[in-house]
């Protein structure tokens, strides 16, 4: 009897433990995803590709509707530009949402979707201080330095778009512009440039290196080129704010505030557009 128990226990000890492929895949999927530079560039590619495809599709649709290809009408390039960024931005944010769904809650802080690590009142104070400083520098560059070299009245692409829509009197166009300037645009750009790119670079580089590289990419995505120094200043300030607070919400807040400021300036007709 004792021999039987002994042999059964030995056989149970020697029995191999089978690990199914399902167990391995579950163990692998339970590991949190770590944001990479490759993912950051993919996010930027999705953003620009979405805008390009929407712009092309809308352009061909307008040509088909109005017969502009036969000379019977004209294509409004400013409206195409606004539509492409607006709907392309919505597609980009949808892609970001699928990323969050795919990688789970651990992915949120990696792209800065969390509360600020400093107190709310300090965060708000930083937003307004940086807003004031950057816009003073931007005004100095555009209204003082550029005229010294014979470049007066240079305005940015968004301001050109607003001026055109205002001239046409399109209510739908103005509504679309406001949604783009105050919601979709700031959220999309901050999620992609600060949330994905800067966060990814910061894993491989010192924080300031990540800010500078991201700011160069941000600057290159705006026009005209004469205003690149302004966009670089904005991006460095917003990148520093993101680095300091660890919260994308603060970067989005100052971006919205900046766009709101220029929208008010445009509505009032003040000559400090950028």
Regions found by a protein language model. Name each.
Residues 1-126, 132, 143-144, 257-274:
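N-terminal, membrane-interfacial amphipathic/helix-forming hydrophobic leader that caps
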Residues 10-13, 99, 152, 167, ...:
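Glutamate identity and glutamate-enriched acidic tracts
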Residues 69-71, 112, 145-154, 200-208:
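Membrane interface segments of multi-pass transport proteins and intramembrane proteases
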Residues 132-139, 162-274:
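Transmembrane helix-loop-helix hairpins at the membrane interface
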Residues 145-171:
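Membrane-interface interhelical connector segments
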